Amino acid sequence: MTRVYLALYKGRKRGTSPRELWQRLMDWAVRIATRGQYSHCEIAVKHGFTDDYHCYSASLRDGGVRLKTMPLPADKWDLIPINQLDAYIDILNYFAQTRGKPYDFIGACGVILGIKGSLKKWFCSEWCAAALGVQYPDRYSPQELADWLGQPEKARQKS
């Protein structure tokens, strides 16, 4: 059985380069503005018997909707199991429709300011919510999507 999760970034970027400082500032700004502990989210699918996950999301750092394979260490990421029937197939189909679409910075700000973003661009929690079939996906921050789905899985299990 394919294990699908909402992965929520709670980590703190380390480093002192201008790029790393900018990323840290942006993570902090998202957490403050949304009054939450998360600054980003992904739909994560366990990848075989490794510690890696196939992660689907819209990312400002990566330029828009993309798939990325990466580990999700428990000190930086919380995982909430998605127990939706056919969730994996739904995610794959939605990704096929939206892959490569640009990041929606104005839409991400709109979660806080109440303004609409672009219908042709995506921000992380909007993309994840839409892929899961949530109504009005553009209204969700990473924290609000986590609250909607439930509490993070505390004990990670190998699948």
Question: Could you say what each language-model-derived stretch is?
Answer:
Residues 1-159:
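Cysteine-nucleophile amide-bond enzymes
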